[in-house]
Amino acid sequence: VLGTIGPRMNSVLDPSISPDCSKVAVRGRQDPGDVDHLWILEGMSANRITTNEGYERHMIWSPDGSRIAYSIQNDGGVSNLYIRASDGSGRDQVLIESEGMHKWYPSWSPDASTVVFHTNNPDTQARDLWYVSVASGETAVLVDDEGIQALARTSRDGRFVAYQSDQDGQMEIYVTTFPRSESRWKVSTNGGTWPKWSDDKLFYWEGNSLMGVRFATDGGFSPDEPQRIFTGEQAGMGASNMMASYNPEYDVNADGTRFIVVQRLER
């Protein structure tokens, strides 16, 4: 562990490293009675850049660092997607807003023209992958298999999307082509959750271990064997099985040399 960022808060989840690595966007609360909101951590300070009352979560920086996509839960209990200037100025841009199904966990394309996300049906708990045009709001389905497809992340070159799915009986990490799911590859070998890309590796959690997978993209997607990077216990995240949660507790920078993790501290 090289250091810490931001003050101690009651709860912090969903960390997202800014493209220049100077800041971290998080879903956090200062006090036990608060709801989760979007905060920007820089140095040892924390700045809330929104004024919404509903739960805010699943923050991610745009490729140029000027905007942040995130979800807000409305009064009816449904989560929709919005875009906010990362300096807190102006108002939220509606990315996709409708009743019925949650829209969670956005992921920008490298040119910031589209955002991939997963839907959640509150009645069936089914989750599918969609994407939306930032300019027009037009949506399309990417993956809608049986069961759960969730926590998608677009690769740094925009050609692939990694996600987790229970199509084989337990959560595993898969990669599909983007913007059309024409081919798919299984990456994990013993379960997986929370996929994240660097330029030349795909990372995910297997139980309490962070795994890294090198890959080649000539003629498709060809992953190497997963290698253990470190454990949650080694990084101060505790001994929990990370696969039991839909709330990512880490992020990685573009060159894959630095990670931000959420440490669990005694109260």
Which residues does each predicted region cover?
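Structural motif
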Residues: 33-39, 76-82, 124-130, 169-175, ...
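C-terminal structured "cap/appendage" subdomains that terminate the fold
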Residues: 201-266
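Acidic, glycine-rich loop-and-beta core segments that form the ion-binding/anion-interacting portion
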Residues: 108, 116, 127-134
